[in-house]
């Protein structure tokens, strides 16, 4: 007596929502677990050069598949395992040391990407790539150049996390939940990021209308300190625990959801901004982007003040200088 009788003659269906995570360090695994817990893929592939660590993480996840809604977790140092990925999340690279700026990491990580990106494209030519490794804006540009993909399919996690930190800190001061505070941080993910004070609001009430000095040195409420805290927060967490991983993991899962579920939600992520806000170079930095099944479906042109546009250009110049 046979236990299971196959009915479909063909071999197994190819996955429809396969997600690959490249790099199984602290950030890669936080992204992986966040994506799994939100049921965003039907197959998950992991890739890394450290074979033992990779196999260990794979086995550990497989042992918990009973508690998840994903049927298959695979891993290998060979990129063949990533074939047919819909989305590839790149977290590989060398990590920021305590006190090291994100931009200092550039050359070390560009070399890593030269090995990774062509392999991804070889096995998943139709994928969308989400770059998380720092300095994310520069590496997203590098990925775009190395991959040959159209610009809408190469996305950097950008200031999605900076905006989340900003919204959390501002909301905390106001005694409300972060989701009820609307605020955007644009530009570089890092030291020259731009807080859009002109667009900060709660329940449709614009904060700059209530306090025209908001975010400036003359602000009695010292809101400028909140943005400084956003910029400094990663450095502080790294100083305390050695790395940041949970918040970026949640942030990446949120972006993943908008892409694989074709949600057309707006997120501040890194995209090619040439010819926007008077930026002439092919530089990647964060603007509000509509994320859907095709990647960045469109860019929302925010009405910024002259000072904010100037800061954005400065952000672009900093990045292009690299």
Curated annotation (Swiss-Prot):
Catalytic activity as recorded in UniProt: (S)-lactate + NAD(+) = pyruvate + NADH + H(+)
Enzyme class, UniProt record, top EC level: oxidoreductase
Pathway: Fermentation; pyruvate fermentation to lactate; (S)-lactate from pyruvate: step 1/1
Any one GO BP annotation for this protein: lactate metabolic process
Keyword field contains Oxidoreductase: yes
Enzyme Commission number: 1.1.1.27
Gene3D superfamilies: Lactate dehydrogenase/glycoside hydrolase, family 4, C-terminal, NAD(P)-binding Rossmann-like Domain
Superkingdom to which the source organism belongs: Eukaryota
Binding site residues for NAD(+): 48-53, 95, 134
Assembly, per entry: Homotetramer.
Similarity remark: Belongs to the LDH/MDH superfamily. LDH family.
Known role: Interconverts simultaneously and stereospecifically pyruvate and lactate with concomitant interconversion of NADH and NAD(+).
Protein name (Swiss-Prot/TrEMBL): L-lactate dehydrogenase B chain
Species name: Fundulus parvipinnis (California killifish)
């Amino acid at each position: 007596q046979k236990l299971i009788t196959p009915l479909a003659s063909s071999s197994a269906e190819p996955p429809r929502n396969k997600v690959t995570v490249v790099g199984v360090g602290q950030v890669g695994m936080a992204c992986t677990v966040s994506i799994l817990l939100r049921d965003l893929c039907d197959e998950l592939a992991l890739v890394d050069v450290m074979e033992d660590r990779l196999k260990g993480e794979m086995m550990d996840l497989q042992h918990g598949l009973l508690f998840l809604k994903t049927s298959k977790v695979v891993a290998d140092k060979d990129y063949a395992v990533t074939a047919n990925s819909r989305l590839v999340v790149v977290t590989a690279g060398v990590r920021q040391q305590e006190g090291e700026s994100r931009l200092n990491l550039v050359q070390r990580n560009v070399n890593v990407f030269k090995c990774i990106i062509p392999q991804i494209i070889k096995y998943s030519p139709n994928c969308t790539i989400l770059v998380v490794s720092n300095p994310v804006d520069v590496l997203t540009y590098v990925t775009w150049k190395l991959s040959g993909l159209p610009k809408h399919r190469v996305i950097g996690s950008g200031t999605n996390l900076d905006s989340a930190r900003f919204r959390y800190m501002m909301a905390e001061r106001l005694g409300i939940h972060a989701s009820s505070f609307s605020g955007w941080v644009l530009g570089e993910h890092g030291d020259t990021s731009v807080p859009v004070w002109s667009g900060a609001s709660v329940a449709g009430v614009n904060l700059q209308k209530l306090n025209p000095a908001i975010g400036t040195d003359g602000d009695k409420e010292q809101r400028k300190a909140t943005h400084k805290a956003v910029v400094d927060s990663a450095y502080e967490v790294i100083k305390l625990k050695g790395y940041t991983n949970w918040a970026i993991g949640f942030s990446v899962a949120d972006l993943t959801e908008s892409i694989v579920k074709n949600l057309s939600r707006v997120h501040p992520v890194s995209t090619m901004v040439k010819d926007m806000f008077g930026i002439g170079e092919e530089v990647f930095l964060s603007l509000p982007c509509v994320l859907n099944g095709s990647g960045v479906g469109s860019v929302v042109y925010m009405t910024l003040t002259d000072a904010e546009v100037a800061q954005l250009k400065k952000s672009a110049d900093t990045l292009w200088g690299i």
